[in-house]
Amino acid sequence: MRVVLFTGKGGVGKTTVAAATTARAAALGRKALVVSTDPAHSLADALGTELGDEPVEVDGGMHAAQVDTQRAFERSWRAVQRYLLAVLDAGGLDPVDAAELTVLPGAEEVLALLAVRDAARSGRFDLVCVDCAPTAETLRLLRLPELLRWWLDRLLPAERRVARALLTRVRSVPMPDATVFEAVQRLQGELADVRALLTEPGTSSVRLVLTPEAVVVAEARRTLTALSLHGYQVDGVVANRVFPAGGDAWRRRWVTAQQAQLEAVRQSFPGLPLWQAAYAGGEPVGVGALAEFGADVYGSADPAGEVPHVPALSVQRTVDGFALSLALPHATHRDATLSRSGDDLVVGVGADRRLLTLPSALRRCVVEGARLDGAGPDARLVVRFAPDPDLWMRS
């Protein structure tokens, strides 16, 4: 079973490549599904057919779906939202403002990931391809499982007795009933399951789609850094709209410029396959055209092949304590940051942040120092820990 998420800068052809990969896998005898989590939902246009919330077979072995996030949101969050509205109403807040405040940030997007999880766990498919939104939205989407779990933990404590102790001090605040707690606990569990699936070694990976242009390649490098920071593995790069050699002077200039960028891709993503799609005379619309496009892209390669697992994060024992190592390809000393917050390590690259919950041994240590080893695609953050004498003997 494989899950492959496709993302890249807007307009590079993510939807076409995701659908073509699915069509190619189906042509090779796999049961394959392509799911759109992009609010623009151009997948139906690429396939030339109407799609709904449930997977439908569009050709032999190939299935497709477009997630109705609004309906999924109402099923999963309505009970909690009703309770929050009652709390805010008891506090005298205007109903319109209260309704705005009870919208869980990013809920609709992450519920699209729950649909992906359900399809992957169903046992019906050998491959699930996910047509994601452009890069910035996809990165936000992939951060959401961890972010929302943090948000929910603070919205309603995990233990009912804690919530009851707090809320009963204020008589005007309604006490949440079992339905509310069950909804929150269910969503917390589902978020953890989504995160586990999408970071599962050998099962899930991200495939970057780009065009051989300097600005697009630069964004792809930043995307690799962000995905590595949050624990997601990239399994390859698809370069779309590559000009074939030959032609007039105008095309030869384009070929020269693109070849320079393709070499930059090889240097920026060493060890990863680089598949290329030639600039076609028209859009591949329909399953037949997409399957042909996919065959041209992947050739004899398996579009759903196994991904060698390269651990992004590791902890090793040292002479003086421990060393935590995190792959951060293309990060620099200028944009990498590090801080400690209780049991969490806050790692940043530029404006991006991730809270890494430390394992038990490291929670009883102090951070002695950190450095960024290597450069370019080989950059890694190494954090040194030493046992805290006041805590280390406790167990």
Name each model feature, range by range.
Residues 1-12, 16-192:
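Nucleotide-state-sensitive switch-loop elements of NTP-binding domains
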Residues 50-51, 146, 223-228, 341-342:
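Short, solvent-exposed amphipathic alpha-helical segments in soluble enzyme
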Residues 166, 192-333, 344-346, 350-362, ...:
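C-terminal lobe/tail of nucleotide-utilizing enzymes
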Residues 315-317, 340-341, 371-376:
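Generic beta-strand structural signal
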Residues 362-379:
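Short, surface-exposed loop/turn motifs with a glycine/proline- and acidic-biased composition
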Residues 382-384:
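Short C-terminal beta-strand
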